[in-house]
Amino acid sequence: MEVTGLSAPTVNVFISSSLNSFRSQKRYSRSLTVAEFKCKLQLVVGSPASCMELELYGPDDKFCCKLDQDDALLGSYPVDDGCRIHVIDHSGARLGEYEDISKVEKYEISQEAYEQRQDSIRSFLKRNKLGRFNEEERAQQEAENSQRLIEEEAQASTIPVGSRCEVRTPGQPPRRGTVMYVGLTDFKPGYWIGIRYDEPLGKNDGSVNGKRYFECQAKYGAFVKPSVVTVGDFPEEDYGLDEM
């Protein structure tokens, strides 16, 4: 069978399994590798990714081909809307075993024994260099995070504490206030700007998760990224919140 790439970025398919009697309809990106696709299917059918064999059936439910190349893209197979992907489980589990979790016996294994197993999720991820085992992807992610931090630090350095500012975030009207905090935080990575708004348009009182970064009334404080803050001559506006 000829295998061709399809242009639509996502596809709606039905998922069935040799372990259960129901079908699920899901949407997936064609840019996933088969190995990555198997990892996502774990949450749908319950089978370990390393124990899956995938079969593709057309919208007419006739067998098309096997998805047997872990490094191939899902979109390189003739997968189209309405197709069915059937998961054959080779873990030794029985039909219906994963349908009622109350019947699943708790299984414990030592870390050392788990590391030696070749059919484990961790072994599958290592073998296919997915997730945290993809050194190149992880290094690229770390480089992007470092570059983002450098850019945020440069932006934050132009925003002095005590200055008047205007905050513009997508989907919200401009809000004015005073810069009360500039720097790193414990609640999320990167540089953040603590704002005391002129009106109760914020989310906190200058503290997050029990740690205080600045003082203000409840609902007057907020933390935003430097990129949405403009410092300048922004006098207080009358929002009409005191009118009866």
Curated annotation (Swiss-Prot):
Keyword Transcription: no
Keywords tagged on the record: Acetylation, Chaperone, Cytoplasm, Cytoskeleton, Developmental protein, Differentiation, Microtubule, Neurogenesis, Phosphoprotein, Ubl conjugation
Modifications made to the protein after synthesis: Ubiquitinated in the presence of GAN which targets it for degradation by the proteasome.
GO cellular component labels: cell cortex; cytoplasm; cytosol; microtubule plus-end; nucleus
SMART domains reported for this sequence: CAP_GLY
Phosphoserine: residues bearing it: 110
Residues in CAP-Gly domain copies: 183-225
Intracellular or extracellular location(s): Cytoplasm; Cytoplasm, Cytoskeleton
The keyword Phosphoprotein belongs to this UniProt entry's keyword annotation: yes
Pfam family, one: Ubiquitin_2
Function: Binds to alpha-tubulin folding intermediates after their interaction with cytosolic chaperonin in the pathway leading from newly synthesized tubulin to properly folded heterodimer. Involved in regulation of tubulin heterodimer dissociation. May function as a negative regulator of axonal growth.
Protein name: Tubulin-folding cofactor B
